[in-house]
Every structure is written in C-alpha cells, then in structure tokens.
Amino acid sequence: MHLRHAILLAVALAPTLARAQESYKIEVLKQAPPEALSGAIRGVLDAQGYRIVDDQGKSYAEIWLRKGTPAQGKPAGSKGAILFPVLKEGELLGALRFSGEGYDYRDQAIASGAYTLRYGLQPVNGDHLGVSTNRDYALLLPAAKDTAIAALPRQKLEEGSSESAGTSHPAILMLTSAPAAASSKGEPALVHDEEKSTWGAVIPLSLAVEGESAPVTLPVQLIVVGVAPT
C-alpha cells in the first residue's frame, strides 16, 4: 500500500517538478494591459509590463503593475510575519495573464487568461502551518468579475479568488522580499531557488504613500513558478 501511495504521489507531482526544473527568464513587455481587464483597472496599470518566458522562448505569464499602489507609509521592514505591513489587505497590485494553463503556489491549475492581482494575508488559523514563514500573498481574481479598483474586504477577496482556481481555496502566488543583489540593479530579475524549486519575479512595485508627493519604489518578489512545501 505504501508503494502504491508513493507511485501515485510521484505521478501527481511529475508536472510540478517538470515546471520547476525548466529554465525561465523575465523580460520587459512593451505592451498595454489586456482588454480583458475593465477600463477602470487598465487605467491604473503601467503602460508596459513583464513577461516570463521558458527556455524555449514560450511565454508562461505576463504581469502589469499598478502605477501607484496606496500605502499607509514608507516601507520600513516587516512586522512579525507580515513583510509588507504598509499595504492594505485586498488592495489592487496589478494584473497577470497566463498564456496557457498556469498554476498557483498550491499547485492549483489556473485557466489561461487575465486576472487581477490583489494583496492578501494568510489566515492565522492553524491550517497553514509550514507553508511559508511570512503571510503575504498575491491573490488572483478573474478579470471579468473583478472590475473595480477599490480594495476588497477579506471575504469577497477570498471568494473571488477561489473562482480563479475553481476550488474552495483562493488562487495565490507567494509574495516575498526581493533579494538585495537582484533588486539593487533597478531592473526586473528572475530568481531561482534550487532548494525550494521556485522561480520568483523581482519587480518594482510603485507605492503612493500618504503624505508623499513622489512615488516610492518597493522591490518585491512574486513566486511565479513553484509550489508550497508539502
């Protein structure tokens, strides 16, 4: 029985391992946000984005960030298990489009197409022990249904995101700190963690800080390939 379970597990994990073992790179995408997004959402996104491509040059995902994500203050480090306490839960961060079938950090299959990206926090309820050391995530919501800019309350955020995966669990991408070596260059980068088998897009999130006339840049790392430890 144990052998059978091991074989079934290996078969189930095969696609995940294959994706993680591929090579990826990030490039600037000089293309406007997709028409699948609402006009209101497109209006607050950058005119160009970032494309994640595999070693064959095939696009895996495309990302557009918000021109100025509202922030409650200047970034000043983490607060407990929250890396980005200046961000409000449910706030719009940007948008993502999967060129083909994509996968979230829980290895849930996500259909090709456009999704909004909103900031969320992992619940502290004992169900997520060992998944990650921080609580920060970007939740994917269907572009056709998430059409307003305003931040969403937690229940609507999680329910809307669950529709992206077609399950009872939100569709999530891990949001974590950008390595200093990658973020100091001021250019987008893709970081490969061989131990965790993840690929993270290091991209500059522009913050509209209360009381500040100029935007503040916060480098973040969005895990676009790879899954949570089991």
Residue ranges and their predicted role:
Residues V86, D127-V131:
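Short consensus segments that form the blades of beta-propeller domains
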Residues Q21-F84, L141-T230:
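Primarily secretory-pathway and cell-envelope proteins
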Residues G113-Y119:
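A short tyrosine-centered beta-strand micro-motif
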Residues M1-I7:
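Bacterial N-terminal signal peptides that target proteins for export
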Residues S78-P85, L92-E101:
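N-terminal post-signal-peptidase region of extra-cytosolic proteins
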